[in-house]
Amino acid sequence: LQKYEYHVPFYRQIQQYRHLGMKGLTESTLDGWFKKTVELLKPLYEELEREVFSCDYVQADETTVPVINREKHRADKEYLWMVRSVMEKLAIFHYDGGSRAGAVIESLANQYNFKGYLQCDGFAGYETAFKANPDVRLLNCLVHIRRHFEQALDENREMAQHALTQIQYIYKIERQCDETGLSYDERRLKRQELARPIMEAMKVWMETEGIKYSPGSQIGKAITYAYTRWDNMMECLEDGRLLWDNNLAENVIRPITLGRKNYLFCGNHEACLLYTSPSP
């Protein structure tokens, strides 16, 4: 609980125990207990992993973790992955030597023969991993697309604001669906009726207006980013369960960010691997 809920490093836990009169407890003792506990939890973690990938709609995200490189006497920026089953609200963390390569998530999905929707941010590694796999249908994140247009407001307010307004309309439709308590199928039909024309018009707008701006400009970058992911976003029109953004996945990762501020780094790759195993 102290380590995973409150993100308290072992050395600080020992200080707390000493204040309570337990002066013989050492960091190596806690570390030993921790490793044995992780070993006992391993079958449960593997079953959770299987359960997540047996679902047909998951979200994935990655976050950084500093890991000490003793040869170079520095902390290297490594990556750990999170995969969340949206409908079942289960999540797992995965560490593969700190790699952010798309092969990591591809290997995980293949290991459990995953078939379904995988929602992610705009990281190109997902596209590389699954572009040749017809069983995995990628979704992207409308919030990430919106952020790029927000960054272009100062450079080209008219163009950026047009895109932001269309995205706002899409979320307004979703709020109406939420407020009226529509079923997933009713939501799909409502999206087909109201959101599809917006999505299709936006695609045409990007095709016709995007070529007028330099790819190096802020608005050019925003349009390119959105356009290359727009077909993936269109998947949301076909299934009322699908979300327009990856926000819930980022919420799952947020405690890791908090922990990173407390423990600062992992001592080695093994420590990071141990850290991810019981995280769910």
What spans do the regions from the language model cover?
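Conserved beta-strand -> loop -> alpha-helix junction used to position metal-binding or nucleic-acid-contacting
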Residues: 122, 133-162
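Short, contiguous acidic/charged loop-to-helix segments that flank catalytic cores in large enzymes
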Residues: 240-243, 262-273
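Basic, short loop/linker segments at the boundary and entry of helix-turn-helix/winged-helix-like folds
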Residues: 1-4, 22-25, 271
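Short active-site loop/helix that positions an aromatic residue
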Residues: 126-132
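Short, conserved catalytic/metal-binding motifs centered on acidic residues
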Residues: 13, 61-63, 118-121, 144, ...
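Conserved small/polar residues in nucleotide/adenosyl-binding loops
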Residues: 275-280
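Gly/Pro-rich turn-and-neighbor structural signature
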Residues: 11-108, 184-234
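Short amphipathic alpha-helical "interface-anchor" segments enriched in bulky aromatics
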Residues: 142-149, 244-258
